[in-house]
Amino acid sequence: MSEAIFQPTDIVLAKVKGFSAWPAMIIPNELIPDNILKTKPVSVHKGKSGSDKKANEDIDADMESEARDREQSEEEEDIEDFGESEANPEKFIIYTPVLKFRKNDTLKSTYCVKFFCDDSYIWVKPMDMKILTSEDCRKWLSGKQRKNKKLIPAYEMAMRGKNGIDIWEFVEYGSYGKPDEEEYVEEEEEENEPEKKAIRPTRSSSRQRQKRASETEKSEGGNSNKRKRVTRSTRQQAIDASEEEEEEEEEKVQEAVRKRPQRTKTKKVVVSKTKPNPKTKAKKEKPKPPKPIKYHFEDDEDWSIVGLGPQDLSIEKTMDPIAKKLSQKKNLEKHVEIKLDLEDKLAGINKLLCDVLCSAINQAVSIKDDFEIILDELQIALDTRGSRNEFITIFQSNNSLLLNFRILFNLRKRELNKWDLWDRFQDIFKHIYSYQFIPDTEDWQLEQNMEIEEMDREKPSFSEDVKEEESKVGA
């Protein structure tokens, strides 16, 4: 709904959660009942953020502005009583020569409204209401949409406009106005009739008793078929009689107090003075203790400390994000599973490197495709290093991988440069160990004599086999 500077006595359409939008009137601060003022919502913000401070400042400003409005209205009333000045129509809504309401200069956080044909008060935010004109009411009543039967009299009353509604009578007696005075007084007198019969004689003068008796005879004689209408004089007589009875009761109480001994008086005074003191002290001596922060076991943030009682959780503020993530059981289980898979994959890469390097030693020419397969496997393994690179330590702690890299770079440097694979292997090495591999100063070469010796060892055995076969044939 629209936000505007609403003024007292404005007719609005207010929306409350769980109910339909209802026509209501904004009640001036001067006419709001005390019990409704006590229910005005004041939100308490415990946080220290800027938005919370701003909200608190807005609430304080609203309270100060309301207090200022009341003081100014009282000052204006005092000035008007003495005849020094008249109310300014720019600052006041002059309802009658006696009744006026101060206008709102700024938008307030809440407004007190009273619903038509419901007579209930509520504090509404400006965003939950909008101005309701007579034309809007006429359109709603003449519309063909389905209507709530309780809303129809409320819209009919709102259609009269704020000038057609007596604000004081609306606040005092409700939507249906002041009740019939004659019926109200007659009921009151009927209720008081048995009380008059039961009243015992008082110490009133003889003239007053004769006067009351003559008046009662006149009232009973004139009301044969229908009860006589109660006038102002009869009501005044009833009030005078009640006042006389109250005065006599007060005299009796004073006489009884005089007859009592002095001790009882002093005791009563002392007791009455000492009673309220401990109550006020008790209220001051009972501050609310701060609520302790307890560990909620159902959160399962750190399942290893379950059963150890309340813990100091302030360490979580400075905890490493990876450690905080692994403190949860499900994340730790997933981490261990990925770690085992990565270790198995590195073991397969090491085996593949050993096979390629050993086969290259026995062969004259290495196969380029084998090294490209190793590069692809290493790249796939590095892709599972984790979002925060937490699995890189598994590569760094694998000594077999480091040894195979050293053999590869020193023994197959010429071939890797020829196939343009040297830089790719160096990039992977730098990604794992944070620096590039520096080959040895002396080039690694295969010992040729080792192959010759192996051939020589095989030849004698072959000749011996031939000789044995020849001897067998000769025999």
Swiss-Prot record:
Q: Does the keyword Calcium apply?
A: no
* UniProt-annotated stretches for the region Disordered: 42-84, 181-296, 454-475
**Keywords from the named record:** Nucleus, Phosphoprotein, Transcription, Transcription regulation
Q: Which cellular compartments is it found in?
A: Nucleus
Q: Where is the composition biased (Basic residues)?
A: 259-294
Identify the domain of life: Eukaryota
Q: Which Gene3D superfamilies match?
A: 2.30.30.140
* GO CC field: Isw1 complex; Isw1b complex
- Name the Pfam families on file: PWWP (PF00855)
Here the segments flagged for biased composition (Acidic residues) are 72-84, 181-193, 241-252
Q: How does the annotation summarize its subunit structure?
A: Component of the ISW1B complex, which at least consists of ISW1, IOC2 and IOC4.
UniProt name for this protein: ISWI one complex protein 4
Name the source organism. Answer: Saccharomyces cerevisiae (strain ATCC 204508 / S288c) (Baker's yeast)
Gene that encodes it: IOC4
